[in-house]
Swiss-Prot record:
Name of the protein described by the UniProt record: Bifunctional protein GlmU
Gene (UniProt): glmU
One GO MF term attached to the UniProt entry: UDP-N-acetylglucosamine diphosphorylase activity
Location of the protein in the cell: Cytoplasm
UniProt-listed SUPFAM superfamilies: Nucleotide-diphospho-sugar transferases (SSF53448), Trimeric LpxA-like enzymes (SSF51161)
Amino acid sequence: MVKRYAVILAAGQGTRMKSKLYKVLHPVCGKPMVQHVVDQVSKLGVEKTIAVVGFGAEQVKEQLGAQCEYALQEKQLGTAHAVMQAAPHLQNLEGITIVVCGDTPLITAETMEALLEHHMTAGAKATVLTAIADDPTGYGRIVRNSDGHVEKIVEHKDANEQEREIREINTGTYCFDNRMLFQALTKVTNNNAQGEYYLTDVIEIIKADGGIVSAYQAPSFDETIGINDRIALAEAERIMRDRICRQHMKNGVTIIDPACTYISAEATIGRDTVIYPGTVIEGKTVIGEDCTIGPHSEIKNCHIGHRTSIRHSVAHDSEIGDDVTIGPFAHIRPLSKIDDEVRIGNFVEVKKSTFGKGSKASHLSYIGDAEVGADVNLGCGSITVNYDGVHKYRTKIEDGAFIGCNANLIAPVTIGQGAYVAAGSTVTDDVPGRALAIGRARQVNKENYVDRLRGKKKS
């Protein structure tokens, strides 16, 4: 078995992005573009993956961690110069090296695997991944010989009229015999207008030395798009989003309007779940089977069980069980845990709280820093008053408690098992189990008050 290696070019600053964030760290569907590339390369069975880093090296290393070894390109002097920085890691090894740009997040493991296999079958020393472009302006053109191998790569500015008609372009992804690659790199010069060392010159050197230079055509130009500005970033986002939605639909998820649905690359969704338009599913969210999500809901890093409905609502960094109903217009804030068969209704905010099985907060409530037991009913306008201006305090509501409408529970406080809190109460002390707490002023009716009031106004 021939050993495989990978070099990922991730040193560019990306000035056209006009951003403080380094280019390869810009996210596509929630994942940095270089992470997309590394994740796909990891499926190829490579012995080593070398990430060539430069601008933002520490941030790139922090993102990729132990998935890669690293080579530093201190000065950006061209693509051949970048690959040369990987020499201490690879130059004396036998095998095949694939070179991929870190700003091509749409490339797939399937296409790279096909490139590697074609390289072996063709007996090539170098193989170029090509693509057919509708508009090849600005790309290097692939000129093939009668055997179908690469005769030369002609840059757009150097191409004659006939060559400019060619729509097969160089994508910037290559496969090389590893030893020959690093031998050829020592012969590359910077005798050009930009004074840079170009990897395309390696192709010419290998060909001049008698090596076969082959080409493998990618199934879709979209896979090969390089991200150099925000316009290309948005296009890659659109393509990736469509790809993600299609994969979920193939797996049994109904997405009513994929064009109006955002699902991160790391989300998992069970079959027979329905996603309505305007829904945003971010991070490593897991959604079970037979759920209804949306319309217009935002879910981030949540774990959601089966048969749960979330409509017109926001949920972040929380656990939500089976058969739960959330919304419309509810907000589940981080570190909340909602057990099975719970209802969180309209205009209810839950913050860093737990709800036991079967409990309900159906309307206009704030439940923060609370432990709510099972089968608890929180009436309209229930508030856990958790903040005194300096510290946060917790409220505990035990199983079966009933909290009347417009009740304020001043934390720290415990409402005992099966206890009742009367509507309109402000509760400052613990309530024993099965007791009724009434914390409000007694009603006083003033007879004939309105007549006296109106009489004063007339006079």
